[in-house]
């Protein structure tokens, strides 16, 4: 709508900015993202410029999972048991404190629910809090190069006052144990794996 919002100087990492204060809620809005690199060359050769990745408009409650704020870490795993840590970073951009609980649900590749946990939280106004939960998963389908089994975890943020979900987030993950040393090289779930690949960028191929 003609108002300057924010400048971001490095194009190879994501950025996130609030635009609600610049919106007109009773009329059409115009959102313009300008890419300007002519005054600051970024390569030793001529390369293309523009937006190469997805751009999203996020809407929701003042209390929400922060962008890219849901992560799963495999603490330990074998064919009998996987020990996972799910970390959800909650952000409260409102002017009052909030509390409630986070509901975590793990699904396997077929969509079947295989585990779940709940964890309470309290977050100050204009604050952040990280909720961590350990989840034990029996008989996991491990991820490897030949059978890249995947799971997903759904995160619901439940407000204490209304008992309603004010935000949801989901991420996909694989369960595997990585080891790297000078004797065996890279091992995935105890099996040696040879690294094969190339550095091919999105622009200018091998020179990108």
Question: For the regions a protein language model found, what residue spans apply to each?
Answer:
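Active-site-adjacent substrate/metal-binding segments within catalytic domains
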Residues: 1, 6-9, 16-18, 62-73, ...
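Accessory beta-strand-rich segments of carbohydrate-active enzymes
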Residues: 1-67, 93-94, 109
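Beta-strand-rich binding/interaction modules
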Residues: 81-122, 129-133
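Short glycine/proline/serine/threonine-rich loop/turn segments at secondary-structure transition edges
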Residues: 23-28, 97, 137-152
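Short beta-strand edge segments in extracellular beta-sheet folds
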Residues: 58, 120-123, 172-176
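Short strand-edge motifs at loop-to-beta-strand transitions and within beta-strands
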Residues: 13-17, 127-135
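Extracellular and select intracellular beta-sandwich modules with Ser/Thr-enriched
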Residues: 51, 114-117, 131, 165-170
